[in-house]
A protein has these predicted regions:
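Intrinsically disordered, low-complexity regulatory segments
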Residues: 1-140, 212, 425
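Alpha-helical scaffold elements adjacent to nucleotide-binding pockets in ATP/GTP-utilizing enzyme cores
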Residues: 16-20, 66, 89-97, 117-121, ...
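Core structural elements
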Residues: 139-149, 167, 197-199, 248-260, ...
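Short helix-coil junctions and helix-kink-helix linkers
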Residues: 260-273, 467-477
Length: 691
C-alpha cells in the first residue's frame, strides 16, 4: 500500500511524475480547480467583509471522494499543483475540500518535471503560501465583481451575452485607441535621395544616401526642396571625406519568458497566444518519447523571469563547448533585463535537458510540438553563447556643401547566430565593405535615384505586439495574456485578419460605453497600479481585503450611475423598407457575430437573410452608384460600391461627396480632417462643424 499521496493538476502529469517515484507513492490528479465561486451569483458576501462563497465545481464530487479516500490511507499528502499563485490556490482549495490534516499535508513545487526536480521538491516540502493564495483570491474576487456588476449592465444597455473584465476591457481600449490613431493619421510626404558612384578599380557601383550638411541632418519634405538640392549639386565634384572602420557586436537574446515566447511564436510560427500556451503546457507536462517513456521537455511555462539556474547554465555552456567549440560559449556574463513587474519566482523557459536535440525527438512529437520545442531549445542555447561580431565601415562623401553617407557591415564571427536568428535579423549591407576607398578619393557620380514616400500610420496590433504592450504597461501577468486576447476575440469585440487585430462595431460600442461609464476600469495607469498592489498581496506587504474594500465602493457607485444615466444602444431588430422576396414581409436588421444583416421576421417559417447595405449618401467614385458600409467576414468595417462585384471600389476610410479641389479625386474622412484619397496629391483640409 502506498504511504504517500501526491496530487498534481493534470492527468498528463500523473504519468510523468509517477515514474520518478517508487511504489510507496500514489500519484493522482485534481483536473485543475476543484472549488470556485458559483456561476449563478456573484458569490461574494459584501456584508461579511467580501468573504468568497466557494462551492465544489460541478462534476468534481466523485473525483474529490476518490482523493479523500486515498488521502485518509496515506501517511502524508503532497500537494504538487503548478508552481504559481494559481497552483498555490488550487492546493489550498484541495486542502479544504479534502479536509486534510495540516500535520500530514505538505506543499511541493518543481519548475520542471524531471527526476531530479521532483525528488528535490519532496526534500524541500513546505506549508502552503497563504500570501500567494490571498493574491489569487483578490484577483478572483475583483474579476468577479467587475464581471458580475458590469456585464448585466451591458446586457441591459446593448445586448445580452456581452461581458466586461478587469483586464480584457483595458486590452480592448488599447486596441481602440490604436484604431483612433490610425483613423486620424494624415500621411506626410517626404523624399529620399541616393547617389550612385563609380569606385576606382571596382566594377560594382556604390550607392550612398543623402545625409544633409556636415552638421545638419536634413529631411527632404517636398519635390520643390528636392529639386533645389539637385540644382545645387549640379556640376559639383565628389570626394571621400571620412572613412571609419570598426567592429560592432550583436548580443545574444535572453531566454524566453511567457511574453517573449508568445511574441516570437506568433511572428515566426504564426501561432496564436492560446495555441502557444496549449503546446507549451503539453511539452511541460510530458510527452511520450520513444525509448524513454513520458518526458517533461521544458521548464514551467508561466514566468516573467529570464533567470537560469546555475546547474542548467553550466550544462548548457559545456554542451556548447563540445558541439560548437570553446570560442562560442559565453563566459558566465550576467544576462539581465530591466523589466517592469518581474516576479522572478521561476526560471526562464528552457529545455529540461539541453542535450535532447530537437532532431533526436522529432518523430515523437507532433509537427507543432516540434516547432515550438525547437524554438525554445535554440533560443536557450543561443542565450548562453557569445555575441555575433560584425566588421563595419562608415563613409562620408562630400559634394559641395552636402554630405552623402554609406554604411556597410560584414559578419566575421557568427556567435549565437550559428544557432538562432530572429525574423527581423538585420541583413548585411554592401557586403563589399566599401573596398578601395580612402579619404580624399575622388568619385565619379553616375546617377541620382530619388524616391517619393509618405509617412505610415501606426500598425494595427497583432497578438504579439499586444502582448508586448500589455507587458510594458504592466497590464496583466504571464498567465493572463493569452486568455485575455482569446476572450475579446471570442466575444466578437475584436476581429483577427492576417495577424492584425481590428475593432468590430460591437467592440466599438462596448469600448465607448466602458470609457464613458467606467473610466477608471479601462484606465491603463489605474489597472497597472492595481496589478502592483496585487503583487504586494502576493509578497505579504498588503492585505487582500484592504484592496477589495477600497475598490468596491467606487465600482458600485459607477454601476448605479450608469444604470440611471446611460442611454441604450440599439443593436436589436430595426424594420427596413426592404421587402422579403420569399414572403413579402419587411425585412429587419439583425445583429450577428459579424455585424448587422437583414433577416425576415417570419423566422422560422421564412429563413431568408441577406447582407445589410448601409448607404452613406455618397456616389461611387468609379461608377456613380451608391457607396455602402460593409463588413469583412471578421467584422472589420469598410466602404464599397453597392454594385460589387461588377464595381470593385473599396476604401477603409469613409468617402466624402466633395471632390478634391487640388486634383479632382475623391476625398475621405480622417478624424476631423478631409483628406485626398490619392496620397500623391496630399491635399488636407479641416472639416467644418456642420459637416
Amino acid at each position: 500500500m502506498a504511504k504517500y499521496l501526491v496530487i498534481v493538476e493534470s492527468p498528463a502529469k500523473v504519468k510523468t511524475v509517477k515514474k520518478f517515484l517508487g511504489s510507496n507513492y500514489e500519484v493522482a490528479a485534481s483536473n485543475g480547480h476543484v472549488r470556485d465561486l458559483p456561476k449563478s451569483q456573484m458569490g461574494i458576501d459584501i456584508e461579511n467583509d467580501f468573504e468568497p462563497k466557494y462551492i465544489t465545481i460541478r462534476g468534481k464530487g466523485e473525483l474529490l471522494a476518490g482523493l479523500r479516500k486515498a488521502a485518509k490511507k496515506a501517511d502524508k499528502v503532497y500537494l504538487a499543483t503548478d508552481p504559481d499563485r494559481e497552483g498555490e490556490a488550487i492546493s489550498w482549495h484541495l486542502s479544504k475540500a479534502l479536509n486534510l490534516d495540516e500535520k500530514k499535508m505538505r506543499r511541493i513545487t518543481f519548475n520542471e518535471i524531471t527526476k531530479g526536480a521532483v525528488k528535490e521538491s519532496i526534500k524541500h516540502a513546505r506549508d502552503i503560501d497563504m500570501n500567494l493564495v490571498d493574491e489569487q483570491q483578490a484577483r478572483r474576487v475583483l474579476d468577479r465583481m467587475v464581471g458580475y456588476k458590469i456585464s448585466p449592465l451591458l446586457w441591459q444597455k446593448i445586448k445580452r451575452g456581452l461581458s466586461a473584465g478587469r483586464v480584457q476591457s483595458v486590452a480592448l481600449r488599447i486596441i481602440g485607441d490604436r484604431e483612433d490613431e490610425i483613423n486620424a493619421f494624415i500621411p506626410e510626404e517626404y523624399w529620399t535621395l541616393d547617389a550612385v558612384f563609380k569606385i576606382p578599380g571596382e566594377k560594382k557601383p556604390l550607392t550612398a544616401k543623402f545625409y544633409g550638411k556636415e552638421k545638419e541632418k536634413m529631411h527632404i519634405a517636398s519635390k520643390e526642396e528636392l529639386d533645389r538640392i539637385l540644382k545645387e549639386l549640379d556640376g559639383v565634384s565628389y570626394q571621400v571625406k571620412d572613412v571609419k572602420k570598426g567592429e560592432r557586436t550583436r548580443k545574444a537574446p535572453l531566454p524566453f519568458t511567457t511574453s517573449t515566447l508568445q511574441q516570437e511564436a506568433a511572428k515566426t510560427l504564426n501561432f496564436s497566444t492560446q495555441k502557444t500556451m496549449r503546446l507549451a503546457q503539453q511539452l511541460y507536462e510530458g510527452v511520450d518519447i520513444k525509448g524513454n517513456g513520458t518526458v517533461g521537455l521544458i521548464s514551467y511555462l508561466r514566468t516573467d523571469s529570464t533567470r537560469i539556474s546555475e546547474e542548467a547554465d553550466t550544462l548548457a555552456r559545456n554542451f556548447i563547448q563540445e558541439q560548437y567549440g570553446e570560442q562560442y560559449a559565453a563566459k558566465g556574463e550576467e544576462k539581465k533585463a530591466e523589466k517592469k513587474n518581474v516576479q522572478d519566482a521561476h526560471e526562464a523557459i528552457r529545455p529540461t535537458d539541453v542535450t535532447r536535440l530537437p532532431a533526436l525527438i522529432k518523430e515523437s512529437l507532433s509537427r507543432d510540438q516540434f516547432r515550438l520545442y525547437q524554438l525554445i531549445w535554440k533560443r536557450f542555447v543561443a542565450s548562453r553563447m557569445k555575441p555575433a561580431v560584425y566588421e563595419t565601415t562608415s563613409v562620408k562623401i562630400a559634394g559641395g556643401e552636402y554630405i552623402f553617407t554609406v554604411s556597410a557591415s560584414k559578419l566575421i564571427f557568427d556567435g549565437f547566430m550559428s544557432v538562432y536568428t530572429q525574423e527581423d535579423e538585420e541583413k548585411t549591407q554592401n557586403n563589399l565593405l566599401v573596398k578601395g576607398l580612402d579619404e580624399h578619393t575622388e568619385l565619379k557620380l553616375q546617377d541620382f535615384d530619388s524616391q517619393q514616400h509618405f509617412t505610415q500610420p501606426p500598425a494595427h496590433y497583432t497578438e504579439a505586439s499586444l502582448v508586448k504592450t500589455l507587458e510594458e504597461l504592466g497590464i496583466g501577468r504571464p498567465s493572463t495574456y493569452a486568455p485575455t486576447i482569446t476572450t475579446i476575440i471570442a466575444r466578437r469585440y475584436v476581429a483577427k485578419e492576417q495577424k492584425n487585430l481590428y475593432m468590430t462595431e460591437l467592440g466599438e460600442v462596448v469600448n465607448n460605453m466602458m470609457k464613458k461609464a467606467f473610466p477608471s476600469i479601462v484606465d491603463v495607469n489605474f489597472t497597472a497600479t492595481m496589478e502592483d498592489l496585487l503583487d504586494k498581496v502576493g509578497d505579504g506587504t498588503v492585505d487582500w481585503k484592504v484592496v477589495v474594500r477600497n475598490f468596491y465602493p467606487d465600482l458600485d457607485e459607477a454601476v448605479k450611475a450608469a444604470e440611471k444615466d446611460l442611454e441604450e444602444v440599439k443593436l436589436e431588430d430595426e424594420v427596413t423598407d426592404v421587402i422579403c422576396e420569399n414572403c413579402g414581409r419587411n425585412m429587419v436588421i439583425k445583429y450577428g457575430p459579424h455585424g448587422r444583416f437583414l433577416a425576415c421576421p417570419g423566422f422560422p417559417e421564412c429563413r431568408n437573410t441577406k447582407p445589410y447595405l448601409e448607404k452613406i449618401g455618397v456616389p461611387c467614385p468609379k461608377c456613380g452608384k451608391e457607396v455602402v458600409l460593409k463588413k469583412t467576414k471578421k467584422g472589420r468595417k469598410y466602404y464599397g460600391c453597392e454594385d460589387n462585384p461588377d464595381c470593385d471600389f473599396m476604401s477603409w476610410q469613409k468617402p466624402l461627396k466633395e471632390k478634391c479641389p487640388q486634383c479632382g479625386g475623391y476625398m475621405v474622412e480622417k478624424g476631423n480632417k478631409k483628406v485626398c484619397a490619392d496620397e500623391h496629391c496630399g491635399y488636407v483640409a479641416m472639416k467644418k462643424e456642420e459637416e
